[in-house]
């Protein structure tokens, strides 16, 4: 047996907890890498890649893509890992620890580094690491999951950004309900009673939080309040029937650390990829829903907001959308109002289930290049020198 082939996974960092909230988008990126790994000889845990010391002393090829990384103290990976550094995002929250002398030496030795975003590219180049913008490996998901347009069905709304003003304010060290917002909530609830009641039944409106992670507030009114905030905004650009017929999904999942396995999380991620690949339309603020949709040529409306794209935003880590946002057709949301600089979207007054549009084509050149690089890397019959040509 020659060199082994591994699949990098990012199991939740539990630190003693029984349940951990996990962004399944990390596993969507693993699904993209898995297309090029046949067979998968073993999983390699990203957060513990420095501890990879196989008993057989054989190296393992590993496509290293994704978000790096929670446990920065475990960087860089073991010498037994032969890495392809591609579609990497280095979090500004971890950059100082990852880019120490040892970390920079690893990146230089195994570069050039394909960067998921332009922020990471600029960051690495400032540290003397050869880097280029590769975009995200999930753009290649059409390689396996693309279906004929005639077989498309269903609509998916996945973690769309919308504002949820706090109904509780703190005054004099005590918590009080905000009177004007409560009145507005009651007014809008009565105004949009039927669609709001229908939407509030969906698990999404219990679980969703625009700030990330899952909403742990289980107050009875919360799903109705979130449904009101969503519907009164999105009805302005999306037809009522589309909003009510769509399936709502959040990428945040609760993981039971005592029973969960990598196979289960990969299966969940793959089931989402298949949904997006088969949809008539996807509406999202999640890049690991939007980019797979581009890759499988599913029409996608990307909802952007200052909170989503800002270098200082709390929707995720700063810098993660540099170079990616331009691949989408975008609706910008500010407060409760939509705007767009996209000429095609500007011509659509309201999206319905019959609205037809095509995505931009800019993503395709990145998908083609990623496919070639990953296929070449995983080829057994090429020397290391040939693979780096």
Where are these regions (language model features)?
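Active-site anion-handling motifs in enzyme catalytic cores
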Residues: 1-389
